[in-house]
Amino acid sequence: MAMGDARTTESARQIAMVCLEELVRGDDRYRRIDEIVGDWGFVREAARPYYSEGVGRPSIDPTVLLKLMIAGALEGIGSMRELLRVADLRLDLRLFLGYGLGERLPAHQTISETQTQRFADGEVFERLFLRTVALCQQHGLLDGTHLSVDGFHAEANAALRSLRASLEPRAAEAEAEPGAGDEAASEPPQLRLAEPRSGPTPKRKATNATAVSRSDPDARLKGKPGQRPHLVHRGQVAVDPKRRCVAGCLAERAEGYEGDALGPLLDRVRFLLPELASVGADQGFAAERVWEDAAERGIIAYIPPQKTMLPRDGRAPRTNAQRLALAARARAKSEAGISAHRLRMADAEGVIAELKNHHGLGRVRCRGTPAFHLQLLLGCAAINLKRLAKHAPTAEQGIAAAPATPAAALSAVSNEPHRDQLRTTIRLGRKQLIWTASPSLN
């Protein structure tokens, strides 16, 4: 074989008429997302209250800003500067944003200001997430009868050295005299240390009751036994086991009881999933009020109780909490309860790992619980869009797709020694498609 001619830079300097749409593959992820979503007009409608009509110069299209944030969540890029460097070089992202080869992308300050200030209340991101859930339901990616719920901790954007002794208002020693109300109202409130000598020092351990972070007051100290504590925020996700789509999410402070988040999560999904019949969670959600609230909603809660909640030595239950704990243990040990437990481990914990490792939820970029909630909404919306790009087009193009196994039917599969033993083969002429009915399907 003869050696080919050497390539020079002359061909790269030539002017050519190219079409950006022809340079991007037809099965590109962002092209498929754009086709599935279709009309992005809901973004402009949700963002309209944040702009002035006819005042000032025209701003950048809010749809472009939101698409850039979606791309950052899909790529797992937290830095806006790095995101714009990547988007400037990639043809698929330029086509997704609607920018030509020679057009300059928005500045990184504009994107940061949009996320942290203009859309800080989260209404636009809530509309985006709800739209992705509705699209998943429209394309048959949601079963809607069972949800797997689990929580996780995301490291806050604050260091331990930012901890300072917390302050609380000083109680009045005596009641104010008549007529002195105006003078007392004008004086600033008197503060004192929450606990004397409670500030963190090298010899004194800080706790949430005695210290607060100056950088992020919403962050809380959490740590496993024997490990160094970290300042974290807590997030909750509700995952549908059919295609592991996220049906609901919630961000909160990492304090109090974890099970109190189950009620707000169910309130968020009750209109999207009216046929919801059961929910599965771990022992961290076990409590009397949680079981009672689920029963009032007509939902079966597969939440195993903790050992301290059960009667000792096999005695009869003496309180209502012990009776509910025994009933919860019976549900957890049933065939459906075992299936719900395995679904939670495979789906909810799998989605949490996906959020942390691939979508930037391992560490909070901004400060405060509301900012973490925006980041969580973007990450969950990115997961749903990724599921849509993978599964929705196959059904629309008429290609035989794997029928998803409902959550209730997976209990028969969960007892097998290997989760991928149940296989079905579909022959399509010369092609052969094999699908696996197991909870590990993406």
Predicted regions span which residues?
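A short, ordered amphipathic alpha-helix with a cationic face
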Residues: 7-10, 57-58, 101
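Basic, short loop/linker segments at the boundary and entry of helix-turn-helix/winged-helix-like folds
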Residues: 24-70, 75
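Generic alpha-helix structural propensity
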Residues: 15, 28-31, 42, 59-66, ...
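Short amphipathic alpha-helical interface patches used for protein-protein assembly/oligomerization
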Residues: 93-97
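A general alpha-helix detector
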Residues: 19, 64-70, 110, 114, ...
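Anion-binding and metal-coordination hotspots
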Residues: 6, 76-89, 99-442
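Short, flexible loop/hinge motifs at secondary-structure junctions
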Residues: 1-20, 401
